[in-house]
From Swiss-Prot:
Belongs to the TER reductase family. The active site is at residue 236. It catalyses: a 2,3-saturated acyl-[ACP] + NAD(+) = a (2E)-enoyl-[ACP] + NADH + H(+). PANTHER family: ENOYL-[ACYL-CARRIER-PROTEIN] REDUCTASE [NADH] (PTHR37480:SF1). Monomer. Involved in the final reduction of the elongation cycle of fatty acid synthesis (FAS II). Catalyzes the reduction of a carbon-carbon double bond in an enoyl moiety that is covalently linked to an acyl carrier protein (ACP). InterPro entries: Eno_Rdtase_FAD-bd_dom, Enoyl-CoA_Rdtase_cat_dom, FabV-like_NADH_b, Trans-2-enoyl-CoA_reductase. Pathway: Lipid metabolism; fatty acid biosynthesis. The keyword ATP-binding does not apply. It is an enzyme of class 1 (oxidoreductase). The record marks 75 as: Plays an important role in discriminating NADH against NADPH. This is Enoyl-[acyl-carrier-protein] reductase [NADH]. Keywords: Fatty acid biosynthesis, Fatty acid metabolism, Lipid biosynthesis, Lipid metabolism, NAD, Oxidoreductase.
Amino acid sequence: MIIHPKVRGFICTTTHPLGCERNVLDQIAATRARGVRNDGPKKVLVIGASSGYGLASRITAAFGFGADTLGVFFEKPGSDKKAGTAGWYNSAAFDTHAKAAGLYSKSINGDAFSDEARAKVIELIKTDMGGQVDLVVYSLASPVRKLPSTGEVKRSALKPIGNTYTATAIDTNKDTIIQASIEPATEQEIEDTITVMGGQDWELWIDALDSAGVLAKGARSVAFSYIGTEITWPIYWHGALGKAKVDLDHTAQRLDARLQASGGGANVAVLKSVVTQASAAIPVMPLYISMVYKIMKEKGLHEGTIEQLDRLFRERLYREDGQPAEVDEQNRLRLDDWELRDDVQDACKALWPQVTTENLFALTDYAGYKHEFLKLFGFERKDVDYDADVDPDVKFDCIELG
């Protein structure tokens, strides 16, 4: 079929299999260009492995360190009539090219919040991966979580706390500057957001893996977070999501103490703002990212997901000098350090009040934002003919859970 982009709200409802594959190949090439090291992780589990930072960590582990990888995600496969999700095509491409490079790659498609997923992962590690993993990457970003204990469904809320938040934002459908107002979260919404996006599920994963004896001596775990800046704090760090991320920090401290007993450790890695399906859903983020991308590109500081993960692995988790990673006062790995530089943030604060519908494209990198957003779904690549026929029914070595 011939597939063109169709955007609705902050979601692109179509995806291009070949474009997604080429995106993955770009990330593999960027990783290989930095050389392969053999002093890092050997067996890696990535929970939330199909897009954004999770996919980038899987690519970095495999193609930067030669690791065997097991990826868990929840995606829709394509059929001969309908395209699947971008994450499905990303994972198919990863699997194909990892196997072609002689690397072990296995994938599980199902609800990563479920006990069934944990049981399947443990079984695979025992029967297929030599019995133990030495790195667990936790990278789930989901608006809903079904609690394994009760079957109850909880939803997260992208809302401020206390007061209605009003700020300049972009209506990404109309490319206009608007005033967006968001009502504050209720106590229940805050609690539910912590349940969905906090550290509870990460801890359940480590509990299950540890009890089953599939964590190697010295195993590490890392979960991803975002703190952002004063500009985004009301909706993010000081909002319901921020409360969930604080819970993630507390969880990391508990897990770190536990894994340190066998020479390992756990950390939250705070990453920079990037264009992902997750960030596109957060009001104010498209405008902030459009500004910060322009400023960081001008300063030669720009990084995408793969550059961030490369730096996390090579300069933090697995330093060549064997030294422990530099952490902040909360024991977090900070990869948002360049974005938070005073010169970058001062430029953002100065630019923010000047942006109007008329000068949006001139003052910010909104054109770059739109391009990156469509690229997430496999579009806007110069090396893909979007008027050519493409088969949406892509199959690969993937275990489907109920």
